[in-house]
Regions:
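N-terminal positively charged helical leader segments and presequences
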Residues: 1-70
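Short, ordered loop/turn segments at secondary-structure junctions
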Residues: 9, 69, 109-113, 219-220
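Hydrophobic side chains in well-ordered alpha-helices
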Residues: 28, 90-93, 203
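Short secondary-structure boundary segments
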Residues: 44, 109-110, 174-177, 195, ...
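RNA substrate-binding interface of SAM-dependent RNA methyltransferases
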Residues: 71-169
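Active-site/ligand-binding-proximal alpha/beta "capping" segment
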Residues: 164-204, 212-215
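Structured adenosyl-cofactor binding patch, chiefly the S-adenosyl-L-methionine
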Residues: 201-236
């Protein structure tokens, strides 16, 4: 991890934090090889970045004296609509999009998403939060994305999505579209990305009826996690 993240439950007082998570304690020892007196990059979830001096480290936890005096990186102005990936891909995808700066993510059901994916233990709040935090630690960011789940396509696209599009450019990435994905946008974007195999024609039509512009990344068919990274890097 490139950043040690604390939350308010870790706070001892105005300047001291107590890290108790066994996984991160092991990381401190084995990867950072941290010893008392070392200074490391730290942040407060939902707050500022800064540095922390390790005061003590034992089996019960690590105590840091912290100074939080820097803003986190600017978020991407994007609402990502992503067809729910396969469970083994979901963890990596959550980490990648968080590291890239996505702050609004909707995971939705589409025709080619297997219904069993929605019963995956990877969708528990604890698992999702764990992977979001790993993404923040990678990118040295502190603000968790908002993640919503839409297990029914039609009610979402008819009843909830239209109100979320005001003032935003809407794009749907899908193979075979006529327009190349634009570059370097400086406006809010809603970006829809389908599952492995893409959206079915009915789904594309429903997005286009709401004003979504169809875009592509070229002739190559990419895995979803690769396409997400490539699209976000190109758009912003």
């Amino acid at each position: 991890m490139n950043l040690i993240l604390f939350d308010d439950n870790d706070r001892l007082d105005a300047q001291r934090m107590h890290l108790r998570d066994p996984v991160r304690l092991r990381h401190l020892r084995e990867i950072h090889r941290a010893v008392p007196g070392d200074e490391l990059s730290v942040g407060l979830i939902g707050g500022a970045l800064g540095h922390g001096r390790l005061q003590s480290l034992d089996d019960t936890g690590a105590i840091f004296t912290v100074t939080l005096d820097r803003n986190p990186p600017a978020p991407l102005p994007v609402h990502l609509l992503l067809a729910l990936p396969r469970p083994r891909m979901l963890a990596r995808t959550l980490e990648h999009v968080t590291a890239l700066g996505v702050k609004q993510l909707t995971l939705l059901h589409t025709r080619r998403v297997e219904k069993s994916y929605w019963q995956s233990p990877e969708l528990t709040p604890e698992k999702v939060r764990h992977h979001l935090i790993l993404g923040l630690e990678q990118a040295r960011d502190t603000h968790l994305p908002s993640v919503t789940f839409e297990p029914r396509f039609k009610p979402f696209i008819e009843d909830r999505l239209p109100a979320q599009l005001s003032g935003r450019r809407a794009l749907i990435a899908h193979p075979g579209m006529a327009t190349t994905c634009p570059r370097g946008l400086d406006e809010p974007v809603t970006l829809a990305i389908g599952p492995e195999g893409g959206f079915v024609p009915y789904e594309v039509e429903r997005f286009e009826a709401l004003g979504f512009e169809g875009v592509h990344l070229g002739e190559r068919i990419l895995r979803v996690e690769t396409a997400v990274t490539a699209l976000l890097a190109r758009l912003f």
